Amino acid sequence: MIELNNHSKINKNENNTNTRNNSSNNNNNNNNINKTNTNKYFEYNQNSIIYSSIPNSFLSHHPNSVGSQCLSLNSFLPPKPPILLSIFNSDTIGNNNNNNYSSSSSRNNSSGCSSSNNNNNNNNNNNNNNNNNNNNNNNNCNIEQYKNNQKQPKQQQQQKDQTIATQHRISLSSSSSSSSLSSSSSSSSVKQSFQIVKRLFGSLSEYMFPQKDEILYETDPYYLYQDDTQSNDSNEFYDDTDIGSDIDEANLNNTYNIQNCNKTLYNKQQQQAHFVNMNKNVNSNNGTGNSNQSNNVNKNQQNNNNNNNNNSHNNNNGNQNSSSSSSNSGASGSGGNGNNNNNNNNNNNNNNNNNNNSNSNSNNNSKSNNNNKKEGKDGATMNGSHPLIPFRKKPAQVPSPCFRMNSPNSDNDQYLDQLALENSSKKSLVVYNTDNLDQWKHSHLNENFDILQNDLIDIQQQQQQQQQQDNTLQYSSPINKRQEQEQQHIPFQFTTEQQQQLQQQQQQQQQNKTKQHPILLQRQQQQKQKQQQQQQIQQEQIGNNNSNNNNNINNNNNINNNYNNVNDLMNKFEIDQKQHDSQQNLVEEKRTPSFHEHNIIFNSFNFICSIVLDGSNIKSTEKYKAKLIIGFCFTILSFIPSWIIFFWLSGINKPAVMAIIAMPMSISSLVILKRTGSIHYPCHILCFTLCFALTINSYYTGGHQSTIRLLMSTVPIISALVLGRKASIQWSLMVLSIYLLFFVANLYGHEYVQGIPSIIIRSHMNFIIDVTIIIMTLIFTLCYQYFIDEAHRETKLKNAQLTIAKDAAIEAYQARQEFLATMSHEIRTPLNGLIGMATLLRDSHNLPPEEKTMAKAVKSCGDILLRLVNDILDLSKLEANQMGLEHIPFRMRELTQQICHVLSGQANEKNIHLSCEVSDKIPSILLGDSGRILQILMNLTGNALKFTQSGYVKIIIDLIEEESELVSLKKGEYNISFRVKDTGIGVPVESHQKIFEAFVQADPSDSRKYGGSGLGLYLCAKLVRLMKGEIGVYNNPDCDGSTFWFILPLEEGTDQSMQQMNNGARHKAFPQDCVKVLIAEDNIINQRVAVKFLEKIGIKAEVAGNGNEVLEILERQHYDLIFMDFQMPILDGLRCSKTIREFEQNHKWNRICPSIFICGLTANTMSTDKKRCFDHGMNHFISKPFQLEQLRSAIEMAIEHKQRNLMNLNIRN
């Protein structure tokens, strides 16, 4: 649908029309049309109707366009097929110049116009009507001939068409000669001007409108007419209030005649065209329709030129109307003007009567005369022929190939599908013309439509053939077999025959591919790729299942393998995780690929990241920021080419050169990032490049008015994300200073270089800047989302690795604890017998002196071995932060004497002088853990004796009166300095720090020469730091050797506390009947040692080999104290203790007696073992190898426990 002029709706109120006419008449004659009107088109773009406007300023290029808009109609139209060109005949353009094409014509010609002007208009109308009469006569003759041709056979049809064409040419020449009103020179000039305008508009139309976007006319198959009866007010559809819905109906009826005439041209090009007889009952309401072929276009153009020339002469004589004629609506006129309009109507009626006489149908003639009379009463000027008038109509919501006609009768039902549409006032029909739809497809949609249809048919046939071949195969489909075997977890294998058959099928499919259309080939390739991916997934699943079965067997065999290193566990975790991901997540990932897969932006970004980051010295913590820099550079490099092209085409060279310079600057930042590994320099270079380039471009595009400067807001964002808060503040101040310079320059009247015209800046630049900002933001957002996804993936992987490592560490710790507990128990058990028997031999009175010395040597060796075991246990406690410290009084001199007594034998063997020096300033009694201090001094003195071949080893203990910076003191504490000085081999200076690490020695060869495990100094350092002290070593300045020192803060003790310890430590014998003791021990040697130790203090004990024997003995007799071993056969000590407590609570022994005191006597010395002891109902705990004093203290505790229980029983009774 096309609207030639943007007519403003004329309301029924006459005041509005008068004011509009007055405003239009005040304009100039030559410019009133061009300034007020715009031409609107309905463009058809595939499935939608789009409005587009063309200013009437293009009309001003034509020299004869003043007052004549109808002349430029054909020049504005793009080349159309014959069915569209036939619309614009001489009747359409000539007769309607006074009816519907005037944009500023008034309803009353008397407003602001003289009577002379109206007379001129009447003359023009008469001339136009005469021309239309000639055309209608010729066209009606052609229609009758066309109807006769339809009844003849198809073989003679081509000859008839040629005769019809010759007749049309004769009619064109006759009508053009009769309708010409001007001289031959004027007509030739008009033709030349028409061709010039047509060429100008051809170039403009190709630039502004695509060739595919066609203008829909009423004959196009995809235009939907809305029913006029939707609204009784015709002003909604027409600009002229006097033209009602009848004009619409007449125009629609005329379209069918036009189609029938135009089909003759399509028959010449296509032999299989269908014909529709739509001539009957077409002119039932508004008279016979006019039909012109495409060959009449030249005649129409001549008639239009003549009419336009006449109209232009009228305008030059003083007519102020914007169009070539007035609307001639006499119903609303008054005075002389109204008389002139009535004359025009009479002339029109006469012309219509002449046209009706030329028609063959008398009934139609009577109907047309009646309709013309009604129109004359209403004041509308219509020709009897009712040509097709382009009018402004509301577009349809859903385009569909349909036409409307009022007559319900139709002869050719095989070509028409009638759909009744009921409206408020009358009924109308929608007729679908399938023939015209096919023609329109060939001419408008796609030239290769038939080729595609044939290709589709070939594809369907090929698919049917393949299905038949598949059905004839004797074996079942390999894919079905694969699915069945996958369900049974059996690997699938093709046979040789099946492989050959599959290869043959693939070759046939490849041959068929070459015959198919490329679009269809792409679809088939995509489907095959999907099938191949699914097959690969299935094969991988089968392979993974087989590998998992093998791995499970290997894992079952290697369950008991222990990992001594965390790296081994991490490697195992990575392998297991890859296998797990391939089993569970591989199918989902391939069926639903990630957003970043098959994405050009992300693939190119990953490629750049791999080039820059691989082999660089960038820290792992700064790789995320390095990726941000790469993302910004990638965004800049992707948009610089478009900016260069834009500025270069606009004629601005300097901004284009700056954009070119920005590319190597961005690339240089990436090179610096790769070589230096620092993120600071590349980020500053990138920010400087952006600021400099955007400042220059802003200067050449308007300065403070330029929208390019808005892009500088990205500079602080880049610096904030990469360099932090300080850098972002600095670059923010830089950007603000640039904005301020532009503003100040504008205040002082500085004229910026306006490289681009202001129109382009206002229209194109803003649009380009907005699109650039949006796309840059989008790319940065996508890159940032990629960073987040990568960070989440890495975090998830690290969390999983940490979880596995944590579990592995816990398992390793538990395994180590179990190992230590087991080894401690297994070592301490024989040590208990060894040290115990050596102690008994040493204390015996009947043993000779030599044998006593031998017993002492065995006892010392056992003590050394016990000390080594204790060191290992202490190490595990220190690493687990489970080491506890005692706070008991001790004498420092006694402690040093004990050390000298123990190590004197080793010193005498090497002829080394061992001495101890204790300062008198040290208090006699101190509070602290004497056992740990003794252990430290023993280790340091033993190392000095071991690495000294001759000379001396001296222990020096002194008080530091001044406050030491190494150790902080509290009130009542003293800094005690301990030094062990020797004349041995010494310690290198570079080894002073690492010598206190675990399993480290100053020289690795020392372990072979002197022995040792490397744990002594490490334990000493741990114990000193645990007691809030410091330890170190230095070489002797006056002699060979070195000095090990440590400082401890110790409190001063009292004499009362020391007396209590001495009283408790006295060796005294207990009465025989004071306590009854039972020893539960499965080792015979330990049984004898325990019995002999108890006999020394006057206690007789009985022995049980396991927990069941203990319960049997307790059923017969009550005992006050039980020394219970943990690990015993049949029933261990823990369960036996718990059973005893249950019996006591339930009174199963049927006697009233105090509860039994149970003392754990075991080689399990771990902290967890002690806790388990108390949880199972034991009262005390002694570790093996035990001493006599430990047994004495346990007996004393048992006596006190017995006394308390007896008192409680007496109170109850």
Swiss-Prot record:
Q: Where in the cell is it found?
A: Nucleus membrane
User: Single GO cellular component annotation?
Assistant: nuclear envelope
Its recorded name reads Hybrid signal transduction histidine kinase K
Coarse class of the protein's main subcellular location: nucleus
Enzyme nomenclature, EC number:
2.7.13.3
Per UniProt, residues of the Histidine kinase domain are 822-1052
Map out region (Disordered) in residue numbers: 1-37, 98-189, 279-392, 495-565
Q: Looking at the record's lineage, which domain of life comes first?
A: Eukaryota
